[in-house]
């Protein structure tokens, strides 16, 4: 079981993420804005799912803050498909970048892969 932090401003997607990942036995904490991600929450998380386009603080700024606190895998889940966004996300420390819409099975597989890499 992993502790997964999901940060996205879309409540329907948050519900989908929580349901799918809890079904796999993970504990899932949801935040709808990057500014609500605290240091203690970052330290709790074994894996972080992060949107890019959010009000208040975008996902890139949130990723930079998180990366200064923890080395837990960060996976972007975003509608931003342009090459510059992908390169920016990976360049600032994200471990993976999935574009919306995504398949839940693929998300589950990527979370599992990053979790097993971290345990090595």
Regions flagged by a language model, labelled:
Residues 1-12, 17-21, 48:
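Conserved acidic segment of CheY-like receiver
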Residues 14, 55, 82, 100:
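The feature encodes the CheY-like receiver
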Residues 30-47:
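Acidic, metal-coordinating helix/loop segments flanking the phosphotransfer/catalytic sites
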Residues 32-33, 58-61:
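Acidic catalytic/metal-coordinating carboxylates
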Residues 41-44, 65-72, 92:
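Conserved phosphotransfer cores of two-component systems
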Residues 51, 78:
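Active-site residues of response regulator receiver
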Residues 84, 98, 102-115:
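C-terminal output helix
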């Amino acid at each position: 079981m992993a502790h997964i932090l999901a940060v996205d401003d879309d409540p329907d997607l948050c519900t989908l993420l929580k349901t799918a990942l809890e079904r796999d036995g993970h504990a899932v904490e949801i935040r709808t804005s990057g500014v609500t991600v605290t240091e203690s929450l970052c330290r709790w998380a074994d894996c972080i799912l992060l949107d890019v386009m959010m009000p208040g603080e975008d996902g890139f700024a949130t990723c930079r803050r998180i990366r200064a606190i923890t080395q837990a895998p960060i996976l972007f889940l975003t509608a931003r498909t342009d090459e510059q966004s992908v390169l920016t996300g990976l360049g600032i420390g994200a471990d993976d970048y999935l574009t919306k819409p995504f398949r839940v099975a693929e998300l589950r597989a990527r979370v599992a892969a990053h979790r097993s890499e971290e345990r090595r």
